[in-house]
Amino acid sequence: LSKLTVCLTSNTIITTPWKPTKEQLLAAAGKTVPDVIAPGLRILFCGINPGLYTAAVGHHFARPGNRFWPALFAAGFTDRLLSPFAERELLKSGYGVTNVVMRATATADQLTHEELRDGGKRLAAKVRRYKPAYLAVLGVGAYRAGWDRPKAVIGRQEEKIGETVVWVLPNPSGLNAHYQAKALAEMFSELKAAVDR
């Protein structure tokens, strides 16, 4: 059996990096990726939704060119550049990962406003249950749509979810050309400084 077959049939989480085939990428549409979550995290990072590459391999922000893992490292959240396949190591430092919308698509543009709003409600319930100190939503457009905050900007938000502080960061996808790696790392560093206060 291949590693992929074992993963799909036994729910085993594969930690050895591998690259999906074109067929596996196409088959990943609509799939989900398990949350990396625990109660009382320092920060719960929240992507918009899994891309096809991420869903195919079963690990968050896995597509080559995604800047999430380099930004975490550059901002000092991790002591080394983690592979997406080592995502569970984040829990040791008090960090986790989830998504606003759980289903995988080729691009976030394929999500409807209803999906984002429903995802925002589901995420708020998850935050109330797990009680992270901070929720970092990675994508201002998704935050605006999911929480009906059309004028939201990057940074700390005025509202909280329960006692959880909400912070919005840019989408780290390589498809987001508005923010280069250095600017992204600086914005992640601002969150790190706030959490460490």
Regions picked out by a protein language model, each given a short descriptive name:
Residues L4, L8-P34, A38-P39, P64, ...:
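C-terminal capping/extension of enzyme domains
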Residues T32-A38, L81-L90, K126:
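Short amphipathic alpha-helices and their capping/turn segments at secondary-structure boundaries
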Residues I37, R42-I48:
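Short, hydrophobic/glycine-enriched beta-strand segments
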Residues N49-Y53, M102-T105, G141-Y143, S173-L175:
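Short, solvent-exposed loop/turn segments at secondary-structure junctions
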Residues T54-E114:
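Short, surface-exposed acidic-centric catalytic microdomains
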Residues T54-V57, R144-D148, H178-Y179:
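Short glycine-/acidic-enriched loop or helix-start segments at secondary-structure transitions
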Residues G96-G146:
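Internal catalytic-core helix/loop-beta-alpha segment
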